[in-house]
Amino acid sequence: MEQQRPKVGLGVIIKKDGKVLLGKRKGSHGEGSWSFPGGHLEFGETLEMCARREVSEEVGIKIKNIKNAAFTNDIFKKEQKHYITVFVTADYSAGKIKIMEPDRCDEWKWFKWNALPKLLFIPVRNLFNQGYSPF
């Protein structure tokens, strides 16, 4: 029997004009909640490589000034999943925001940090509850 182990997720906190970019999740755990672009860290990948790849795949934009920010320990009881989520910050660089994965995201929207939507994806909620601020 294979032992369950936590997985490593990455969230990219993209900043522009004092706001952060969040997407409304669908088709996966956390459906209906708002989350940063991101995903799984692949074997041999740096955090910066993962951030650029995930943002390109999900949002279709370029980012710059990627910096390590924080991490959370996230347990999804209902789904029986456990993640260590590493967050990086990045500045918006170029491109038009698009829904690149319509089966996974309903919309992308900019929010002020002190006015985030109520229904946050567990890692984002945990990050906010830690008192973290990207500004």
Descriptions of predicted regions:
Residues 1-20, 71, 86-89:
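Conserved N-terminal beta-strand and adjoining loop/helix that marks the start
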Residues 41, 63, 72, 92, ...:
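Hydrophobic pocket-lining residues within nucleotide cofactor-binding pockets
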Residues 72-96, 124-127, 131:
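Active-site-adjacent beta-strand/loop module that shapes the phosphate/pyrophosphate-binding cleft
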Residues 89, 98-130:
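NUDIX/MutT-family hydrolases
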Residues 36-68, 88:
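The catalytic Nudix box helix
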Residues 29-34:
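A conserved beta-turn-beta hairpin within the catalytic core of GNAT-like acetyltransferases
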